[in-house]
Amino acid sequence: MANVYDILLERGYIKQITHEDEVRELLGKEKVTFYIGFDPTADSLHIGHFLQMMVMSHMQKAGHKPIALLGGGTAMIGDPTGKTDMRKMLSREQIQHNADCFKKQFSKFIDFEDEKAIMANNADWLMNLNYVNFLREIGVHFSVNKMLTAECFKQRMEKGLTFLEFNYMLMQGYDFLELNRRYGCTFQMGGDDQWANIIAGVNLIRKKERKPAFGMTFTLLTKSDGKKMGKTEGGAIWLDKEKTSPYDFYQYWRNVDDADVEKCLLLLTFLPMDEVKRLSSLPGEKINEAKKVLAYEVTKIIHGEKEAQMAKEAAEALFSGGESLNNVPTIELDESSLGCSVVELLVDIHILPSKSEARRLIKQNGLTINGEKVTDSELKVTKDHFKNGELLIRRGKKNYNRIIIK
């Protein structure tokens, strides 16, 4: 079996790594227990998490043992990484609900049967810490001067970094130490924005336990223009089908830029390398065939083969002018809601997050109702717009929603 390190390297996952030669040898010789942390700050995982779970799946298939660490404790503080403002504080109840939602989604990627993987929650050890003992045992190993040079803190210094958030690095380092003590975990992985936090944990274990510990970060999922992947005019792309329908999920990947096809096939599917190279090198319009394969494969991983096939058929029916709308995201509307402007309707039924987004879409000629382009943001949506009790909204070229009257 190929060394999983070489697989991750070839597919373009690895961004930074500590002790590179040791890690490659370790992953080729021994079964390693590793972890990735996920702070439950929302009630669903999103595309950014998807890449990390693909890494976990590759690692598990190679015989290594994953720990999915839910940040029930660290979410009470909020990670300042990549944020220009302090995160909204969540209640314990919200965090617990979100953690429960995450657990269901992890099982699609990771096999937890027969102790092949572990799901842990750092609330188990963080919530009852003795503060003085924590400072004496952990705080003594952290240099404030060094912490302030970390990119995650630099970005916040101008606007103000709270002491609450400043503790996040210590707590993430302590997580690694605790997982090392409890489960023999020696390897932490995460997005490249977590490099400083990961290094902190590696150094803590090496200083305090005098044991080997390692860290690796992955490429962040960005588009060819450098912007983060996974955002649309309707908001984030979620892995929960109640928040982002399988059809919308499929369409997102079907519509990626030509320049991003190869990266997405490498990072977000299990297709063999020769097939990835063949698809990503298709010339001109033929690259659309690669996008269809990408959309199908990614949707299959997240939502299963049946949902992927239904989304594919719905997209093809709409593209060819067919009339089968059964698999298009459908919203039921109370008749009493009619008579409002199209802008208000789009926001009320959660197709778009704000009226300004709706007006911008109309201004850019990106909205149609039943095939007719909408040019007036004050257009009143009435029963006359419904054909056989249905109204079809299209955003952009290929994002559809069906509205039916209850």
Curated annotation (Swiss-Prot):
Q: Which reaction does it catalyse?
A: tRNA(Tyr) + L-tyrosine + ATP = L-tyrosyl-tRNA(Tyr) + AMP + diphosphate + H(+)
Report the InterPro entries cross-referenced here: aa-tRNA-synth_I_CS, aa-tRNA-synth_Ic, Rossmann-like_a/b/a_fold, S4_RNA-bd, S4_RNA-bd_sf, SYY-like_C, Tyr-tRNA-ligase, Tyr-tRNA-ligase_bac-type
Q: Which residues does the annotation say bind L-tyrosine?
A: Y35, Y168, Q172
Pfam families named in the record: SYY_C-terminal, tRNA-synt_1b
The principal localisation class reads cytoplasm
* Superkingdom of this protein's organism: Bacteria
Of the GO CC terms on this record, one is: cytosol
Location of the motif 'KMSKS' region: 228-232
Protein's UniProt keywords contain Mitochondrion: no
Q: GO: which molecular function terms?
A: ATP binding; RNA binding; tyrosine-tRNA ligase activity
**Alphabetic keyword roster:** Aminoacyl-tRNA synthetase, ATP-binding, Cytoplasm, Ligase, Nucleotide-binding, Protein biosynthesis, RNA-binding
Record NCBIfam families: tyrS (TIGR00234)
What family does this chain come from, according to its entry?
Belongs to the class-I aminoacyl-tRNA synthetase family. TyrS type 1 subfamily.
Q: Quaternary form?
A: Homodimer.
**What protein does this entry describe?**
Tyrosine--tRNA ligase
